[in-house]
UniProtKB/Swiss-Prot annotation:
GO terms for cellular component: endoplasmic reticulum; endoplasmic reticulum lumen; endoplasmic reticulum quality control compartment; membrane. It comes from Homo sapiens (Human). Keywords: Endoplasmic reticulum, Glycoprotein, Signal, Unfolded protein response. This is ER degradation-enhancing alpha-mannosidase-like protein 2. Glycans are attached at residues 90, 112, 289, 450. SUPFAM superfamilies: Seven-hairpin glycosidases (SSF48225). Its main location: endoplasmic reticulum. GO terms for biological process: carbohydrate metabolic process; endoplasmic reticulum mannose trimming; endoplasmic reticulum unfolded protein response; ERAD pathway; mannoprotein catabolic process; positive regulation of retrograde protein transport, ER to cytosol; ubiquitin-dependent glycoprotein ERAD pathway; viral protein processing. Involved in the endoplasmic reticulum-associated degradation (ERAD) pathway that targets misfolded glycoproteins for degradation in an N-glycan-dependent manner. May initiate ERAD by promoting the first mannose trimming step of ERAD substrates, from Man9GlcNAc2 to Man8GlcNAc2. Seems to recognize and bind to exposed hydrophobic regions in target proteins. PANTHER family: ER DEGRADATION-ENHANCING ALPHA-MANNOSIDASE-LIKE PROTEIN 2. It is found in: Endoplasmic reticulum lumen. Pfam families: Glyco_hydro_47.
Length: 578
């Protein structure tokens, strides 16, 4: 791949105009080194608590110190946290977890899984870890990055999702059974983000494997949404994937829509696709014209542009970061500062904030340790160097430690008004929140490489450049090296015979007898002592005694609340009267 292709990708933030803000209230910005170490300690407190109390379940329940499956029974937190380990510099634990995942994760299971969440967390997490494996000192196989065990796992998981795309419109169902495909009677109503958030992972997968089917279905889904926009250029919140009719016609940048816009921009940068960027810029005009008020973004009726809900949702806080990626720094900073005032008011971002009233919305007062405002701070700090952005990072560390930290990890904040906690630690806390905090305070991290160093890699298809920077984060904060997409370009029939044999060999399942979740008699899991974690010999015996037993609990299948519940909270819903 020509090195010049990395310039618009890797140096995008570095080339943006520089803005220099005022110092903090004490006359100086927070000390990055101090907060970097505190963020690292936060990560290991949460990570070790998961290993000791919850693995191999999906997530940790920090108040009861046990685990439960949520999105699909994949040991999800371990997959989501894997690339964060390397960003924090823990190569030995990264190497160990790669082996654990190969032995313990199975996608041939009778589970109804969210297509959206499985893609961004599992497929995205495995692809990122695969591309970072060599940097982490993993002994990669011949042909890497065009082959490898984590790539095969990512491909297997993605193939389990493909039946969801077999609809008349090409827009996917929201849920698929990993063993049987789409269940009879599955609801055809899917949120916009659940349709338009595949191009980053699926295009990467197609480029690495040589199978175009993944990128093809992702592009079709993107185009169908584009073709379904209203005459004033807006898209709604939920659509029927069988008929293509909008069911919920609320238009905005937040929950149910957010990552669709994000993936148009990131897909355009990753693939250097002018058409995707042009689509986003057209949406951006409509968003500014109809939803933006005093640097806030409201919800409006997608056909009329009339306000349906004057609230700020915490998920919308990704928007300033997205604006920074297209160079719109001034608008990004103004919106960011609006959101930061809400953080200062509550010590976190409530799920819903009523803008005219200046307070939380009933039943949406919680803060599940979401990353979006921190993500925007990280992007904007890279572009501006404004110390105000470090102050947000400082405030986030202080708030989360003070309110959310418990003996077993960090608990979701159920209510920011009285600091009541909920018994859940979502995997994105380790995948996104902690990662973006660390990168905010670590300006020399390899993720921020400006192209001054790189690795030349020989593949079966020629030489390519990797590790030069310009990483594209998927919406779960899993970094993808865009140069990798140019390492494996070939036609399917041109693949080396040895690679075909390798795939055939690895299609045989590795033994998983050591890591069964459905039986207690399989024996305890005993993580070895490792540098950089808080797991000590003294608590090995305690971990053995607390080995969680498999519980029969329903899995989650939607990115947030059930469809009907969500619409009731969103306010007025506009149904098609035809």
């Amino acid at each position: 791949m020509p090195f010049r292709l990395l310039i618009p990708l890797g140096l995008l933030c570095a080339l943006l105009p520089q803005h220099h803000g005022a110092p903090g209230p004490d006359g100086s910005a927070p000390d990055p080194a101090h907060y970097r170490e505190r963020v690292k300690a936060m990560f290991y407190h949460a990570y070790d608590s998961y290993l000791e109390n919850a693995f191999p379940f999906d997530e940790l329940r920090p108040l009861t110190c046990d685990g439960h499956d949520t999105w699909g029974s994949f040991s999800l937190t371990l997959i989501d946290a894997l690339d964060t380990l390397l960003i924090l510099g823990n190569v030995s634990e990264f190497q160990r977890v790669v082996e654990v995942l190969q032995d313990s994760v199975d996608f041939d299971i009778d589970v109804n899984a969210s297509v959206f969440e499985t893609n961004i967390r599992v497929v995205g997490g495995l692809l990122s870890a695969h591309l970072l494996s060599k940097k982490a000192g993993v002994e990669v196989e011949a042909g890497w990055p065009c082959s490898g065990p984590l790539l095969r796992m990512a491909e297997e998981a993605a193939r389990k999702l493909l039946p969801a795309f077999q609809t008349p419109t090409g827009m996917p169902y929201g849920t698929v059974n990993l063993l049987h495909g789409v269940n009879p009677g599955e609801t055809p109503v899917t949120c916009t983000a659940g349709i338009g958030t595949f191009i980053v992972e699926f295009a990467t997968l197609s480029s690495l494997t040589g199978d175009p089917v993944f990128e093809d279905v992702a592009r079709v889904a993107l185009m169908r949404l584009w073709e379904s926009r209203s005459d004033i250029g807006l898209v709604g919140n939920h659509i029927d994937v069988l008929t293509g009719k909008w069911v919920a016609q609320d238009a905005g940048i937040g929950a149910g829509v957010d990552s669709y816009f994000e993936y148009l921009v990131k897909g355009a940068i990753l693939l250097q696709d002018k058409k995707l960027m042009a689509m986003f810029l057209e949406y951006n005009k409509a968003i500014r014209n109809y939803t933006r008020f005093d640097d806030w973004y409201l919800w409006v009726q997608m056909y009329k542009g009339t306000v349906s809900m004057p609230v700020f949702q915490s998920l919308e806080a990704y928007w300033p970061g997205l604006q920074s990626l297209i160079g719109d720094i001034d608008n990004a900073m103004r919106t960011f500062l609006n959101y930061y005032t809400v953080w200062k008011q509550f010590g976190g971002l409530p799920e819903f904030y009523n803008i005219p009233q200046g307070y939380t919305v009933e039943k949406r007062e919680g803060y599940p340790l979401r990353p979006e405002l921190i993500e925007s701070a990280m992007y904007l700090y890279r572009a501006t160097g404004d110390p105000t952005l470090l102050e947000l990072g400082r405030d986030a560390v202080e708030s989360i430690e003070k309110i959310s930290k418990v003996e077993c990890g960090f608990a979701t904040i159920k209510d920011l008004r009285d600091h009541k906690l909920d018994n859940r630690m979502e995997s994105f806390f380790l995948a996104e929140t902690v990662k973006y905090l660390y990168l905010l305070f670590d300006p020399t991290n390899f993720i921020h490489n400006n192209g001054s160093t790189f690795d030349a890699v020989i593949t079966p298809y020629g030489e390519c450049i990797l590790g030069a920077g310009g990483y594209i984060f998927n919406t779960e904060a899993h970094p993808i090296d865009p140069a990798a997409l140019h390492c494996c370009q070939r036609l399917k029939e041109e693949q080396w015979e040895v690679e075909d044999l390798m795939r055939e060999f690895y299609s045989l399942k590795r033994s998983r007898s050591k890591f069964q979740k459905n039986t207690v008699s399989s024996g305890p899991w005993e993580p070895p002592a490792r540098p950089g974690t808080l797991f000590s010999p003294e608590n090995h015996d305690q971990a053995r005694e607390r080995k969680p037993a498999k519980q029969k609990v329903p899995l989650l299948s939607c990115p947030s609340q059930p469809f009907t519940s969500k619409l009731a909270l969103l306010g007025q819903v506009f149904l098609d009267s035809s």
